[in-house]
Amino acid sequence: VNITESIDVHTQSNWITGKAKNMVIRRNANSITVQGSLPKYQYGNNLQTLQRADTGLIIEELSDLIRTDLSKARLQRVDFSTNIITEHKPQYYYRFLGHLTRFYRHSDNSSLYYNQGCKKLLFYDKIKDAKAKQMLIPKQYQNKNVLRYEMRLLKQVKKFFKRDVLANDLINKQLYNY
């Protein structure tokens, strides 16, 4: 764990920042912020799908690392994703994904986006993305067409779920049936 100390020039708050694998952990007298990808923390990539039980173990591991129980931490941003192995290149399927009410639809050569303020839906070629980021591609995805779907709640997680979502909710199956 690399640890640095800094002072926020706007608030004069003293921050301690540490990094564990891909996770950045910031702490001051009033709050703790943990940023990063749980699958990347666990597997070193985000191609593999993280199981709910593994999510709980990661929360425990990070809690032990910083000596603070993170299970009751309020989530400010959540990304949900899955990979779909397809017959054709992912871009082939974009034309079948029409418009979505109250979302702005935008596509480029390799991705399809649906934007609605703090909520974003993305479809893209995960293998192309992984290669561009020089990620190791797990064997089950090598030489495959992989369509990645992501739903990103960039803010207002509470508004979307109509309640505070805590870190330990990530292991609860009902959260994913919403």
Predicted regions and their residues:
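Structured, helix-rich domain cores that form ligand/interaction pockets
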Residues: 1-178
